Amino acid sequence: MTERTFSIIKPDATRRNLTGKVNAVIEDAGLRIVAQKRIRMSRAQAEKFYEVHKERPFFGELVEFMTSAPVVVQVLEGENAVARYREVMGATNPAQAADGTIRKLYAESVGENSVHGSDSLENAKIEIAQFFTEDEIVG
């Protein structure tokens, strides 16, 4: 089934000018980038986006990191896009990520792991709507 999922190329990757390399891995995996923009995430945006982690000890550090440099927000489309992109991203801990995955190739640590991807179709819809209007998604 053709689906859409949401992706963020995080500050550790944009700082190192890896957007093109990450996009190449995404596209090589058969996913299409149907919307993309480089933004500076505001504190309010980051707090809302990661609200599910609000009570976790790393929440403040996560918000600081996500607002520390530009990010690239994206909508990806393809067959089973949510699961496919999670596979392409690799494990949260880059040391445990499979060879050829984005995190194995580019992540620096568990906290600075280069990319975010939606964990479900339901969350993908919510996350996409936080950053894109339907007019900005060109499939």
From Swiss-Prot:
Its cofactor is Mg(2+). The active site is at H116. It is found in: Cytoplasm. ATP binds at K10, F58, R86, T92, R103, N113. GO terms for cellular component: cytoplasm. GO terms for biological process: CTP biosynthetic process; GTP biosynthetic process; UTP biosynthetic process. Keywords: ATP-binding, Cytoplasm, Kinase, Magnesium, Metal-binding, Nucleotide metabolism, Nucleotide-binding, Phosphoprotein, Transferase. Disulfide bonds: none annotated. It catalyses: a 2'-deoxyribonucleoside 5'-diphosphate + ATP = a 2'-deoxyribonucleoside 5'-triphosphate + ADP; a ribonucleoside 5'-diphosphate + ATP = a ribonucleoside 5'-triphosphate + ADP. Pfam families: NDK. SUPFAM superfamilies: Nucleoside diphosphate kinase, NDK (SSF54919). The keyword Transmembrane does not apply. Its EC number is 2.7.4.6. One of its GO terms (molecular function) is metal ion binding. Gene3D superfamilies: Nucleoside diphosphate kinase-like domain (3.30.70.141). Belongs to the NDK family. Homotetramer. Major role in the synthesis of nucleoside triphosphates other than ATP. The ATP gamma phosphate is transferred to the NDP beta phosphate via a ping-pong mechanism, using a phosphorylated active-site intermediate. This is Nucleoside diphosphate kinase. It comes from Phenylobacterium zucineum (strain HLK1).
